[in-house]
């Protein structure tokens, strides 16, 4: 199987061009390639596939093999891959996802994609404002937002001291989120600036 590993601000996936390749069991392949010590090491597997309703289709599998609906950083890499490898030949494209069709606007320089902007659609609030959750004996307030996939935004006083490798999975797999959730931890610096860790 030919693959490409790409990352968008550190969110790394293994990408397979399914215009040319076939992946028999993508859930299992995602688990194998995501293993950071014995596999390739990634946050998951993304398949770039033909689509009947868009320029291409993105299927995203998390490192545990579950299929996710969308990933903003992942879809930006899909756009770059699709253009740079000739799947598309225009700077504005549509990509089918489980979270709906997303529209990408790419800046091209020297025949290659330099930046990709994604129209994620209008975010939908998915919880009361704010909602409380308890993890590891700590009660935190969060705001639930859906941008094609679920996010929980937590406001904290100090993002630098957070052990994200420990607390991230605890929030992601919390019973409050039966379909898992992406967690963002935010410190408000002032009215115009935030500090965030994902």
Question: Where do the language-model regions lie?
Answer:
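A glycine-rich beta-to-alpha transition motif near the start of alpha/beta enzyme domains, typified by
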Residues: 1-112, 152-198
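Short acidic-hydrophobic surface loop/beta-edge motif
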Residues: 4-6, 93-95, 130-137, 143-145
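Short, solvent-exposed secondary-structure boundary/capping segments
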Residues: 112-120
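Beta-strand scaffold of nucleotide-dependent catalytic cores
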Residues: 118, 143, 197-198
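Ligand-binding beta-strand-loop-alpha-helix segment within the catalytic cores
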Residues: 121-128
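Glycine-rich, charged/polar anion/phosphate-binding loops
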Residues: 128-129, 138-141, 170-172, 182
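Internal active-site segments that recognize and position negatively charged phosphoryl groups
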Residues: 134-161
């Amino acid at each position: 199987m030919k693959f490409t590993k790409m990352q968008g601000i550190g969110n790394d996936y293994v990408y397979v061009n399914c215009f040319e390749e076939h992946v028999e069991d993508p859930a299992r392949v995602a688990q194998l390639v995501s293993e950071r010590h014995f596999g390739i090491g990634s946050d998951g597997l993304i398949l770039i596939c033909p689509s009947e309703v868009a320029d291409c289709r993105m299927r995203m599998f998390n490192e545990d093999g579950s299929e996710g609906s969308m990933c903003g950083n992942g879809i930006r890499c899909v756009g770059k891959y699709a253009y740079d490898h000739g799947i598309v030949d225009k700077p504005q494209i549509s990509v089918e996802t489980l979270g709906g069709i997303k529209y990408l606007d790419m800046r091209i320089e020297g025949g290659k994609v330099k930046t990709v902007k994604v129209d994620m659609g209008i975010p939908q609030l998915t919880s009361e404002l704010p909602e409380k959750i308890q993890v590891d004996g700590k009660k935190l307030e969060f705001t639930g937002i859906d941008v094609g996939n679920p996010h929980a935004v937590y406001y904290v006083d100090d993002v630098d001291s957070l052990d994200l490798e420990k607390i991230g999975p605890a929030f992601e797999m919390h019973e409050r989120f039966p379909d898992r959730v992406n967690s963002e931890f935010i410190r408000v610096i002032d009215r115009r600036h935030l500090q965030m860790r994902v």
